Amino acid sequence: MAVFLWRNLFQTTKARMLQQRRASLYNGAHDYDEELIKKKLQQFAGGSINLSKEHSGIGILTLNNSRLMNAFTGTMMLELQERVTELENWKDGKGLIICGAGNTFCSGSDLNAVKAISNSQDGMNMCMFMQNTLTRLMRLPLISIALIQGKALGGGAELTTACDFRLMTPGSEIRFVHKHMGLVPGWGGAARLVRIIGSRAALQLLSRAHGVDPERALHLGLSEGTLSSSDETGSLEEARAWLSQYTEGPASVIQAVKKVVTAGRELPLEAALRTEKDVFGTVWGGPANLEALTRRQK
């Protein structure tokens, strides 16, 4: 009976939290038509978003459009949403590394797509679409790293802020270039940047639009460290090793840890406490907890 009740509680809580993570920030009341913007984005093809899920519970999400420094085309934006949905359903997942192909991270949006949707409504729809996707990415119950090689520019810089941690390689750079394009971040990058490094430092980075090298990023708290390797294979192996210190243990427990931290960051205190209680209930008396209690008795 106890096992049945635990499983029922776990499934109910899991379903409710999954629904909350997928909830759109915007709807028709905001003049947001997701199907319309999907049709528009579908017109701008090129590149891909590749996902490999390893037996260790680590996912590798690769931006692949090396001809344009891994800039997001319209179809890549759509594929990113699909990959996030896939990761939301990955019950064995523990961690995620986001990287770019060809020793560079991401140069933002494909300018051909930007020019074609330069009217206000299309731009707003694209903004809302990417905010939805990157918010869901940030809320994944996986511990995530942006592995920054080469350049992370504009929207690429914004993408790094949707990850829990950032690791940089020698000679890499994060740069919020939006001001030089007559813009501000539109994919949620400004709001997330303020939460990562504070409002004063965020204002400096956005208003000066200067590049941030690994040393300064570490000083600002924008990066957790600089890897020793700058090549694609070596840096990925280093990132895996770095992430492993946080992902040791059962996937259910790692995901629970991420969920309570996300709740504490985003929700008012009372709501965060209720979420913590619900998540606690999914692991209390669960397999990992019972195994740990058995080990302690020996």
UniProtKB/Swiss-Prot annotation:
Annotated catalysed reactions: (2S)-ethylmalonyl-CoA + H(+) = butanoyl-CoA + CO2; (S)-methylmalonyl-CoA + H(+) = propanoyl-CoA + CO2; (2R)-ethylmalonyl-CoA + H(+) = butanoyl-CoA + CO2
UniProt GO cellular component terms: cytosol
Highest taxon, organism lineage: Eukaryota
Record's subcellular location: Cytoplasm, Cytosol
Pfam families tied to this protein: ECH_1 (PF00378)
Top EC group: lyase
InterPro entries: ClpP/crotonase-like_dom_sf, Enoyl-CoA_hyd/isom_CS, Enoyl-CoA_hydra/iso
EC number(s) given by UniProt: 4.1.1.94
PROSITE patterns: ENOYL_COA_HYDRATASE
Predominant place of localization: cytoplasm
GO molecular function: carboxy-lyase activity; methyl/ethyl malonyl-CoA decarboxylase activity
Keyword list, A-Z: Cytoplasm, Lyase
Classification via CDD domains: crotonase-like (cd06558)
One record GO biological process: fatty acid beta-oxidation
Function text: Decarboxylates ethylmalonyl-CoA, a potentially toxic metabolite, to form butyryl-CoA, suggesting it might be involved in metabolite proofreading. Acts preferentially on (S)-ethylmalonyl-CoA but also has some activity on the (R)-isomer. Also has methylmalonyl-CoA decarboxylase activity at lower level.
Family of the protein in this entry: Belongs to the enoyl-CoA hydratase/isomerase family.
Protein name per Swiss-Prot or TrEMBL: Ethylmalonyl-CoA decarboxylase
Source organism of the structure: Gallus gallus
